[in-house]
A protein has these predicted regions:
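Primarily interfacial, aromatic-capped hydrophobic alpha-helices that serve as membrane anchors
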Residues: 186-215, 313-358
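All-alpha helical catalytic cores of prenyl diphosphate-utilizing isoprenoid enzymes
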Residues: 87-153, 159-160, 164-177, 181-296, ...
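Hydrophobic core of alpha-helical transmembrane segments in multi-pass integral membrane proteins
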Residues: 73-81, 181-182, 200, 204, ...
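Alpha-helical membrane-embedding segments
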Residues: 287, 310-316, 381-383
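Acidic, carboxylate-rich catalytic segments that either coordinate divalent cations
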Residues: 352-405
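Conserved N-terminal diphosphate/IPP-binding helix and adjacent helical/loop segment
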Residues: 1-147, 156, 222, 226-238, ...
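Nucleotide-sugar-dependent glycosyltransferase catalytic core
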Residues: 299-312
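Alpha-helical transmembrane segments of multi-pass membrane proteins
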Residues: 251-255, 280, 341-357, 368-375
Length: 405
């Protein structure tokens, strides 16, 4: 199966069917945490925050690159605390990710000094996904030219499209130019800048020449198509069925992480492509749950904003937890050399991000559901929701960066 339009359609339909068949009931197979276990984890988090206070206090005085590096370290430390549990393989992976992240921030700021903390962290999130795939496929965990190029590609182009001074016609021409550049075609006519896109694309081409790695560029075209189609979700959707709307989300999420897989190894077998596509779908659904407030304010349609109009989010969130577990397990056995599988670590990280969103949006859930799901949380939900507020107090408007997926 390839990242052709037909291949993407087949994968989208497969995961749409899996999502529809997944029960919206509390999971019965996740690890449960005792009250004593939660209390111990909370003590560890408190200690972590206390150690971070000196840097938090001078956060606003830091250069943007230093702030991004600090947030990366905080993300790593929290991830180790919540999911690593002293596993040497997990500890090594987090250490390697932190090293790659530091290098990423330096290279990103060198490429474009105007990139904001938000831009860098958005791009760094993809680098972490890329690193997790490297480890799952028994590749060294590191920054590569193509991972830097792809991770920065959409923050840079989004900034161009969202920036002032460009007419709708110019933005439409720019999107058409993006497609042609991805296809390797020359673009004629005057261009009022390209958002750095062509230079980033050249980073990918330096590692994966077009003539030798056509699947890499098919995957890049697939995510470009998916992003364009998903713009339907930014407007009125009443004329579209629920399955169609879900398919737009699934296609966008799946193709975005499939690109990472191709950039790790240059080619993917059908099993690896299916597993990584599913990984991307999970991350997209989690993003949508975490962004519930912002999407509602902006009028963007997601499975969660639509469900929230008719009642509590109990069922759709329970479905997401079950879907996450079923899908992430497909990452098992991807390593051709019998290397370490990170599926358990990835599953734990994803579940924690879902629970953090539940804690923040507790008013959107019934008391019965909150009590049921708290059994699977390493922290009390009341503590987890308050933790978000504590970080916000110290980092002001930057608080969401630490807890973003």
């Amino acid at each position: 199966m390839e990242s052709s339009e037909n291949g993407v359609l087949e994968l989208t339909d497969r995961y749409l069917a899996l999502w529809s068949e997944t029960p919206g009931t509390p999971p019965g197979h996740l690890r449960r945490f005792s009250a004593a276990g939660k209390a111990e984890k909370e003590r560890e988090v408190n200690l972590l925050l206390e150690k971070s206070l000196p840097e938090m206090d001078r956060f606003g005085e830091m250069e943007e690159g230093d702030r991004a590096r600090y947030l990366g370290r905080a993300h790593t430390a929290l991830g180790k605390l919540m999911t690593g549990e002293g596993d040497p393989a997990a500890d090594r992976f987090f250490t390697e990710c932190e090293s790659a992240g530091k290098m990423f921030v330096r290279r990103a700021k060198k490429f474009d000094p105007s990139l904001s903390d938000d831009d860098i962290h958005q791009a760094l999130r993809n680098q972490w996904v890329f690193n997790s795939i490297q480890s799952s496929l028994s590749h060294p965990v590191t920054l590569t030219p193509s991972s830097l190029g792809y991770s920065l590609m959409y923050p840079c182009t989004d900034n161009w499209i969202d920036g002032a001074g460009h007419t709708p016609a110019e933005k439409d021409r720019f999107n058409q130019s993006l497609k042609l550049w991805l296809e390797g075609e020359p673009v004629t006519g005057k261009e009022s800048g390209d958002g750095g896109f062509r230079e980033l694309l050249r980073m990918i081409e330096s590692e994966y020449p077009r003539e030798g790695y056509p699947a890499v560029y098919m995957s890049l075209l697939a995510i470009h198509r998916a992003q364009q189609r998903s713009l339907i979700l930014h407007g009125p959707v009443e004329d579209h069925g629920e399955a169609f709307l879900q398919s737009l989300t699934i296609e966008k999420g799946g193709t975005s992480v499939a690109v990472d897989g191709y950039l790790v190894s240059g080619a993917l077998g059908p099993e690896a492509l299916q597993a990584l596509f599913g990984y991307g779908v999970v991350l997209q659904f989690i993003d949508d749950l975490q962004d519930m407030r912002e999407d509602t304010s902006a009028g963007h349609s997601t499975v969660f904003t639509r469900a929230g109009r008719t009642g509590p989010l109990d069922g759709v969130t329970a479905r997401l937890i079950n879907f996450t577990c079923d899908t992430i397990r497909l990452l098992n056995g991807l390593s051709p050399g019998g290397g370490i599988s990170l599926s358990r670590l990835i599953e734990g990280s994803c579940i924690f991000l879902i629970l953090e969103a539940v804690a923040r949006y507790s008013h959107l859930y019934t008391g019965a559901y909150l009590r049921a799901v708290e059994e699977f949380s390493p922290l009390r939900l009341s503590y987890l929701g308050g933790l978000h507020d504590r970080v916000r107090t110290n980092l002001a408007s930057r608080e969401h960066l630490l807890f973003s997926a």
